[in-house]
Amino acid sequence: MKVLALFLLAGTVAFSQPKATAKAATAPILKHQVVKAYPHDREAFTQGLFFQDGQLWEGTGLYERSGLRRVELATGKVLQVHPIGEAYFGEGLAAVGNQLFQLTWKNGLMFVYDKGSFQLQKAFRYTGEGWGLTTDGKQLIMSDGTSALHWVDPLNGSRLATIRVTDGGREIANLNELEWIKGEIWANVWQSNRIARIDPKTGRVKAWLNLTGILTAAEAQGTDVLNGIAYDAKGDRIFITGKLWPKLFEIRAN
């Protein structure tokens, strides 16, 4: 499909051709408040992120550098790490039960690990690219760089359902890292400083969160894009970071 580029503030959000004709309302843009900043490994090309058991779990990308890691929130210290192999570009990461699931970008493989030991148990094949991954607690939800979100069975890797994400009647492409937060899917949009809050039933964007300027000019030197959302359900805390970012932020949406 033809892709139209629409520049929104400091970020770029890619839209595919509209399926709806006209004057559909676009979702509101929310402001954010930084609650606290934590150190983040500047060598971590963050592709997947979630918070569980009082710790961060992070999947990193780039060929020859991709891995899986468990991280101490307060210090950013890497407590456990598992390289996934030089031939793989790691992507989204999620946990269901005692298993970790990690996507690869173009290898068409989803790796399944034991959560405690990081030992590889098996791999599922899928078509297309792998970008973001989260879970609603039962099923995996996967993005592939388009406007699609796929529900995936964690038992066998089969796709169960697909929705298209839209705002104002236009499909939102480049959906990247994902997080399930209070019944919504939050999604980074590649090459954008915004996060989309998505209704998982309809695919409609309910609101945008604008994170432009969260890094100072000095902090932004040598970094890549915003990517990484984690939710602490017990503490009701939201964390965000980016690829090669020096900080991870706890934020509150206003």
Task: Map each language-model feature to its residues.
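Hydrophobic, well-structured mid-protein blocks that either form specific transmembrane helices
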Residues: M110-G168
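Conserved beta-strand positions in repeat-built beta-propeller and related beta-rich domains
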Residues: E58-L62, L100-N107, M142-T146, A187-Q191, ...
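Beta-rich, blade/repeat-based domains predominating
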Residues: R42-D53, E86-G97, Y126-Q139, G169-G183, ...
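Short loop/turn segments that connect beta-strands within beta-propeller blades
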Residues: E72-G76, D114-F118, P154-G157, D199-G203, ...
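Blade-loop segments of beta-propeller domains
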Residues: T75-V112, F118-G130
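Surface-exposed loop and turn segments in beta-propeller and other repeat-based domains
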Residues: K36-Y38, L79, P83-E86, T162-E171, ...
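Beta-strand-rich domains and repeat architectures in extracellular enzymes and scaffolds
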Residues: V35-G67, H82-A94, G242-L244
